[in-house]
Curated annotation (Swiss-Prot):
PROSITE patterns: ABC_TRANSPORTER_1, ABC_TRANSPORTER_2, POTA. It comes from the Bacteria. NCBIfam families: potA. ATP binds at residues 46-53. This is Spermidine/putrescine import ATP-binding protein PotA. It comes from Mesorhizobium japonicum (strain LMG 29417 / CECT 9101 / MAFF 303099) (Mesorhizobium loti (strain MAFF 303099)).
Length: 364
C-alpha cells in the first residue's frame, strides 16, 4: 500500500440531505464537501444526530442526496442503487445468517454475484486466513463470540473486493477490552487489503486510534478534516476542541498575528506564544485552548495562578482541577509514578506553566 495516496476514492461535493417538507424540514446534511483518498482509513466522527450516518448511507446508496454529487473515482454514483456500486457496508448488527456456517456467510455475497464455486472456495479460504478464523470455518455463527462474529462480518464484506468499505459503528456492541482488540484488527485489515475504509463513530478514542484522517461533524456540517494529531492538538473550532478529549478554554487578548502564530495575553497578564487555527481572522480577543497534559503545576509562580479545588486519580494519570485567580477553571493532567500522591493537595496555591507550542487560538 502506498504511504501517500495520490488520488481520491470518494469525493462528496456540496451534498445536502433534507428530510420532511414545509415547516417540518430538517437538514441532516448542509452543503457537505469532503475528499477521501484511495487506500486511507477515514473516519466520520461526531455526536448522535450530526449527519455522519446519513452521509455514510448516501455513499452506500441506501438513500439519495437532495442536492450535490458523490463521486467514486470521478464517476457520479449518487443516482446509482447500492448493488451497482463497488461499495460494501458493515453494520453495527453484523446481519449474519445464524443458520449458515462461518464459511458460508463469508461466501454468500460471492454466490449472489454468480461467481464460480472454485473461485468462491478459494476466496473464502483467503478471507478466513485474513481474519484468522480457519479453525472455525464449519461452525455456525450463532456458536461463536461477538468478536468472532465481527471478524466474519468483515470477511464477508471484504470478500467481493470492494473499492470502498463502509463501517457504521461496528464496534459499539463490544465490551471495552474486545473493542480495543478490534481497533487494532481493523487497522491491520485495512493496511493488508489496501481498501479505502470509511468508518463512522461517536467514539473519539476509536477515531484517534485507527484513522489516517478524521472529519469532525456537527449539525450536518463538517467542521474540520485532518490527521488525528491535527484534530487533537490543532483544533480549529470550539466544538472540535471540546468534543475531542479534555480541553482548557482561556480568554486572551491577541496581538502580532503572523506566520501561523500570535501573542496571547491571558487574564493573568502573562503573554504566551500560541499557534492560530486555519482560517483565523485577526481580532482583539479570542479563545485559547490548552490540553491538560501540555501544562505543568508548580508551587512557584507560573503563567497562571490559582487554587487546587479537586484531585482525581485515574490510575495512569491524575487530573488536578484548579480555580484560577482570574475566575476561569483549568485542569492539569499529570502522569502518575509509583510514588504516592501527586505532590499537591486541595487548597494549595499553585502556579501553572504552559509549555512551548501548547496553546492554540480558535478561529470561532
Amino acid at each position: 500500500m502506498p504511504d501517500k495516496p495520490d488520488r481520491n476514492a470518494i469525493e462528496v461535493v456540496n451534498v445536502s440531505k433534507i428530510f420532511g417538507s414545509g415547516e417540518g424540514q430538517v437538514a441532516a446534511l448542509d452543503k457537505v464537501s469532503v475528499s477521501i483518498r484511495e487506500n486511507e482509513f477515514f473516519t466520520l466522527l461526531g455526536p448522535s444526530g450530526c449527519g455522519k450516518t446519513t452521509l455514510l448511507r448516501l455513499i452506500a446508496g441506501f438513500d439519495f442526496p437532495t442536492a450535490g454529487e458523490i463521486l467514486l473515482y470521478g464517476q457520479d454514483i449518487a443516482p446509482l442503487p447500492p448493488f451497482k456500486r463497488p461499495v460494501n457496508t458493515v453494520f453495527q448488527s453484523y446481519a449474519l445468517f445464524p443458520h449458515m456456517t462461518v464459511a458460508d456467510n463469508i461466501g454468500f455475497g460471492l454466490e449472489m454475484l454468480g461467481k464460480p464455486k472454485a473461485e468462491i472456495k478459494a476466496r473464502v479460504a483467503e478471507m478466513l486466513k485474513l481474519v484468522k478464523m480457519e479453525a472455525l470455518a464449519g461452525r455456525r455463527t450463532a456458536q461463536i463470540s461477538g468478536g468472532q462474529q465481527q471478524r466474519v462480518a468483515l470477511a464477508r464484506a471484504l470478500a467481493p473486493q470492494p473499492k470502498v468499505l463502509l463501517l457504521d459503528e461496528p464496534l459499539s456492541a463490544l465490551d471495552y477490552k474486545l473493542r480495543k482488540e478490534m481497533q487494532i484488527e481493523l487497522k491491520r485489515l485495512q493496511h493488508e487489503t489496501g481498501i479505502t475504509f470509511i468508518f463512522v463513530t461517536h467514539d473519539q478514542e476509536e477515531a484517534l486510534t485507527m484513522s489516517d484522517r478524521i472529519a469532525v461533524m456537527s449539525s450536518g456540517k463538517i467542521l474540520q478534516v485532518g490527521s488525528p494529531w491535527d484534530i487533537y492538538d490543532k483544533p480549529a473550532e470550539r466544538f472540535v476542541a471540546d468534543f475531542i478529549g479534555e480541553t482548557n478554554f482561556l480568554t486572551a487578548a491577541i496581538s502580532g498575528t503572523g506566520n501561523g502564530k500570535t501573542r496571547a495575553t491571558l487574564k493573568s497578564g502573562t503573554t504566551i506564544e500560541a499557534t492560530v487555527a486555519e482560517g483565523f481572522q485577526p481580532k482583539d480577543n479570542a479563545t485559547v485552548v490548552v490540553r491538560p497534559e501540555h501544562a505543568k503545576l508548580t508551587k512557584d509562580k507560573g503563567d497562571l495562578s490559582g487554587t487546587v479545588e479537586n484531585i482525581v486519580y485515574f490510575g495512569t494519570d491524575t487530573h488536578i482541577h484548579v480555580q484560577l485567580d482570574s475566575g476561569e477553571a483549568f485542569t492539569v493532567r499529570q502522569q502518575n509514578t509509583r510514588s504516592a500522591g501527586c505532590g499537591f493537595d486541595r487548597g494549595d496555591k499553585v502556579g501553572i506553566l504552559i509549555g512551548n507550542d501548547a496553546a492554540q487560538v480558535l478561529r470561532d
